[in-house]
Amino acid sequence: MKELALWQEVQADLQQVEAELLRQVDAPDPVLSQAARHLVQAGGKRLRPAFAILAARCCGAPLERILPLAVALEMIHMATLVHDDVIDASPIRRGRPTVWARWGQELSLHTGDYLFARSLILVATYDDPRIPSVLASVSVKMVQGEIQQLAAAFDLDITLRDYLDRIYRKTALLIAASCELGAIAAGADTATIRHLRYYGRNLGLAFQITDDVLDMVADPEQLGKPIGGDLRQGVITLPAIYALQASPKKQKLIHLLGKRDKTQAEIQEAIQLIKDCGGIKYALDIAEGYLERARKQASYLPPGVARDTLTSLTYYIRTRGF
């Protein structure tokens, strides 16, 4: 992340998460172990373990209670990334070759499956039945979100409701679960668990919307991959949904977005049309609405540094560059 001051609140804890991640992904097979370690060492924001840790801190729980869960959440997230890269045939992620690009499809799929299976072992260390129950439900819905996205590829009739349902399943659910499960593992009361779940849900929706915006406007070096990846794959995101209704050059945009073999120049042209009619601003305004809802939920949490950090994260999400 923006190694901002607010993230320093959990930096030491995230270092322990990182060390435990590397320990957990070791496999008897050296190639599988190498592929899994490659994925961990590619880095990332580690948002999901951070949210679980901050949620637990709101409730006064030590890292020891939350560490297995925090690592499991990141492993589930990494498993989805490996599978995404296979589906999208993505050669680069976070500025490094993907597991798919380096080891091929079969090992990539096995690596994702292995990470998910290892996460189950960690989750099984908790006695509270709500923890595996929530994660099982979330995992099913995440897969449904991925299938929704595949089924809707190049579908220019996608609605705002369709889009929000897809990103809720694909992204927001796991962030909401990270907050909720951090509170459950910490022994929080029902109201605190609910506020943290809704905080994560709203922040997760805003995070994915801004991620979709960044795919059109970010610096490719900061992003770690070329921009326009969604348009190339036929994934119609919120800025494009708005532009398909509002652009004075709607027919041109329909032609560009509907093409299955776009050149980079055509992708850039489509992005410019989306920008020109206000698609980026519209999407960011929608994201800001969800961030405001997240701040409202955070205001109900016990006062302290953890709550302040959760609130500060809502402002970071809106202004991040990658």
Where are these regions (language model features)?
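All-alpha prenyltransferase/terpene-synthase fold signal
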Residues: 1-322
